[in-house]
Amino acid sequence: MKNRARRVIFSICTYTLLLLGLVGQIIIGGSNLQGETLKKEKTEASFQDIWSGEWQSNFENYLTDRLKIREWLIPIRNQIMYSLFKTSPNGNIIIGKNGNLYEEEYICFETQIYPPMTEDEINILVEKLTVLDKSLKDKEKKLFIFITPSKAEIYSEDIPVRYLKIAPDEKLPSTYNLFIEALNQTDIAYYDSTQDVRNLKQTSEFHVFPRTGTHWSKVTAAICAQELSDSMEKQLGIELPECKVKYQKCKEPLHPDSDIYNLLNLLEKPDEIFYEPIIEITDTCKEDYTILARGGSFMGSSLNRLIQNDYFARSYYMENTFAVCPEGVYSGNFDTYDSLPIQEMIEDSDIIFLEVNEEAISRMSFGFIDYLLENDILELP
């Protein structure tokens, strides 16, 4: 009787799961999964692949990826890993102390698991910037550098202990400190938002970097955008609009405040209080300057906010591998700088703006500086 009861229970569970899978396959809509959930593409069969078993394996993955119940099972599995075992289901996202999430790369640079740049390497970079600055000044143009902070530096106290154990005990001078020291020996105009963010962390009611994001919060970015504008006015001798930044709580996170939390594909909503900036333009007086900006994702919620509020007459905006230019020039993804009319963009611009995160100084501007110097782009008519 016991064996029969077990078989009945097993059969009921099996058929229930099959029924749920069938119902899920019918009623579940498009995928809402994010991050590492790319589906396998169907591959053509060849005799060699069939003989080796590779085609069968690929076809099995192809069918598995298209089971719509997968969209239920992945968040359930991920939530169990995250809540019960405090384990990240995404290998690139690290769960720190106090539930603070990090991208591993930022931790490795901050702890010097990845060694910092040497003083000679920094000097070579700053020498290139000095040459660029002089060349632009000769053409009556202006160079401005914008330095943005790393979450792993601002919230270093929440880095997991296991990274501190494998980091070197004796720290070398950091890339960031060497870079600032070298810049201070030049006449290059720059705004370092890192110290302002450190100070804001001590006084604000919100997290300057949300626990759920890898970037600074929308409010932090707006406050630093205001400081950036003031710094550009003072150092470049130009006039830009003035604004005041306030903030209020919001029910849902604004991008990018939960960007890496979303990549975990969990069932629960993030346990974080989110805020949204309220920006009031108090003075619209400005001079008609055209800006060419090159940088990474931290630029998207800071400088781009100034651009969207018409701080500049025109803008050529290059963030990572995406460019937004005036109508008729170019907008979209680009693989190389040769895809863009860089010479014409430089010629039309008054300000060349370079953003760099303190973690990314070693790859500053994604080769843009070298491209300008090595291709005689600054030899304008």
Where are these regions (language model features)?
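Extracellular glycan-modifying ectodomains
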Residues: 1-381
